[in-house]
Amino acid sequence: MSKPPTFVPPACARAERLVTERGEFAVLDARPAGAVRGTALLVPGYTGSKEDFIALLEPLAAAGFRVVAVDGRGQYETPGPADEAAYARPELAEDVLAQAAAVRGTGRVHLLGHSLGGQIARAAVLRDAEPFRSLTLLSSGPAEVSGEQQQRIELLTAAMAAMNMGQVWDAIQAMATPEELAEPDEDGTRAEAALRARWLLHSPAQLTATGRQLRTEPDLVAELAACGLPTQVVSGERDDTWPVELMDDMARRLEADRVVIPGAEHSPNTDNPADTARALAGFWSAHA
């Protein structure tokens, strides 16, 4: 789970509802003060939300990019149905295509997905690459997650079947290590209340369906490479969801731009947002 430094967007961003042909999605829409060099759509990961990218918005807008971070269906402030079928991978991919259509205007969109969001973004590109100028896979591997993470997802799925979301949150916090607990917010308060509020709005059906996808995702790297879309693979220096070496190999197979963010683990977007934003802006500028 990414832990954003705050849930309050910067002055350059507005919290809005993005209207698409597949419904409305909660977004943070950050815009540059001057000319727009490109538009990027950011897709969050498992248990995440648009706020996971909040520390990237200001530096990317300052670099000239409009950045739209989205809550997928069933994530935080985008409601979703209780039917797991609504969160099948093709459905989520179509959502991304609809979001891209709503923000792209006359140009194409830089697409970024973090963790699970990277695999959803990949599925969208495989369905239709035309709306996209580039793809960034941020801490998102080629296939299923590590064995340890599969076990954690299985435990979470079982807990959601037996308890309500508040009880599940309390159990997660009770088992967390000190390093996994929420850090103080930028204003000195604990971020735990905001993280808990986000968790309570997640759809259990979404978490169950996408958790299953993370445990069973096939390797589609060859298919993605065949699309010919400029691709960037970004990770931290270590990652317990997909080993860094696995992402190195994926980048080679994709002939992708490869960036390792110093001091970061599974969430470079929150662990080291300055270097992450710099890497993204450089890649997007090269493929404007």
Task: Give the role of each language-model region.
Residues 21, 62, 68-112, 278:
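Active-site loop/oxyanion-hole signature of alpha/beta-hydrolase fold enzymes
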Residues 1-40, 62-65, 201, 285-288:
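Alpha/beta-hydrolase fold catalytic core
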Residues 145-151, 165-225:
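Conserved alpha/beta-hydrolase catalytic His-Asp/Glu region
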Residues 226-264, 270:
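Conserved loop-alpha-helix segment in the C-terminal half of the alpha/beta-hydrolase fold
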Residues 26-80:
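Conserved HGGG/HGGXW glycine-rich cap/lid loop of the alpha/beta-hydrolase fold
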Residues 122, 126, 132-163:
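Flexible "cap/lid" loop of the alpha/beta hydrolase fold
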Residues 113, 117, 121:
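Gly/Ala-rich beta-loop-alpha elbow adjacent to hydrolase catalytic centers
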Residues 270-282:
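Post-His helix in hydrolase/transferase enzymes
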